[in-house]
């Protein structure tokens, strides 16, 4: 990989039957950017990421990384690309019955020989690398627990540790915080940002929330109806841009930016009445 490997999406579309999920997308992402892709449900965000990783093939157009076309890869070259382009999912995609350490070690499968994978044995160095990844995500204490016993936030951090084991050049995160509470969402986004800043790994993450995208991403891409309707730095995501991305509700009113917030809000306590309690149903 060159020192300035670029992910390029050229005229990419994806159709499912008569429905067009993604339409004529053209994006160039230099190495080291942290990109937030925002938009309403059904805007085409997940389909875009799945095409980049080649979980879904484009109906037309091409995808390049570091000058090589990845949209035509098959067999071993495709597996190498999916190793280099790690995917993090909303629903974690862990093996619940396996312990956390083994789930993280599975990120090494595409680095190993077929025989080693069939034997199911990992080296001491690989185990040490997996533990280090868990320590970095502050969940090493869960290493021997079944992954299915962890909270959602912990499971997502395990998924990030597994992605790190792939030694990726690109990380794609498909709605990584959609099922998490605000505090766990912050931990997950802090982790992705740390990886981006420390390793210089390109991170592209789908997000529903504007405040999260503005806080963590140095570039925001807005999608609506399968098309890119905004592409720029967070400071350019103004009211008009938000309207283009999120549109209006069924009554025609503009979508309020407040409803896309993940901020933790605390409701003020209501002082209890000092007077005697009255029965709700007198006579009972």
Swiss-Prot record:
The encoding gene: phnC
PANTHER family noted in UniProt: AMINO ACID IMPORT ATP-BINDING PROTEIN, PHOSPHONATES IMPORT ATP-BINDING PROTEIN PHNC
Function of the protein: Part of the ABC transporter complex PhnCDE involved in phosphonates import. Responsible for energy coupling to the transport system.
Localization annotation: Cell inner membrane
Name of the protein: Phosphonates import ATP-binding protein PhnC
E.C. number(s) listed in UniProt: 7.3.2.2
Entry similarity comment: Belongs to the ABC transporter superfamily. Phosphonates importer (TC 3.A.1.9.1) family.
GO CC entries: plasma membrane
Entry keyword set: ATP-binding, Cell inner membrane, Cell membrane, Membrane, Nucleotide-binding, Phosphonate transport, Translocase, Transport
């Amino acid at each position: 990989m060159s020192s300035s490997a670029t992910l390029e999406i050229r005229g990419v579309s994806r159709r499912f039957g008569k429905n067009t999920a993604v339409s004529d997308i053209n994006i160039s992402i230099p190495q080291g950017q942290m990109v937030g892709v925002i938009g309403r449900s059904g805007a085409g965000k997940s389909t875009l990421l799945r095409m980049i990783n080649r979980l879904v093939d484009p109906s037309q157009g091409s995808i390049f990384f570091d000058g090589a076309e990845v949209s035509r890869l098959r067999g071993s070259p495709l597996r190498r690309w999916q190793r280099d382009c790690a995917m993090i999912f909303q629903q974690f995609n862990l093996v619940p019955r396996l312990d956390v350490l083994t789930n993280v070690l599975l990120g090494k499968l595409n680095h190993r020989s077929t025989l080693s994978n069939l034997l199911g044995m990992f080296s001491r160095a690989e185990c040490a690398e997996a533990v280090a990844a868990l320590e970095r995500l502050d969940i090493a204490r869960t290493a021997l627990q079944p992954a299915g016993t962890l909270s959602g936030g912990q499971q997502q951090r395990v998924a990030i540790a597994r992605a790190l084991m792939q030694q990726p050049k690109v990380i794609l995160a498909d709605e990584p915080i959609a099922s998490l509470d605000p505090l766990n969402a912050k931990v997950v986004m802090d982790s992705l940002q740390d990886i981006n800043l420390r390793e210089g790994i390109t991170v592209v993450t789908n997000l529903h929330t504007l405040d999260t995208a503005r806080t963590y991403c140095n570039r925001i891409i807005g999608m609506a109806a399968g098309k890119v309707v905004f592409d720029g730095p967070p400071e350019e995501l103004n009211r008009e841009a938000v309207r283009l991305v999120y549109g209006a509700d069924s009554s025609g009113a503009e979508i309020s930016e407040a409803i896309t917030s993940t901020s933790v809000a605390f409701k003020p306590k209501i002082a209890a009445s000092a007077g005697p309690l009255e029965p709700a149903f007198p006579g009972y």
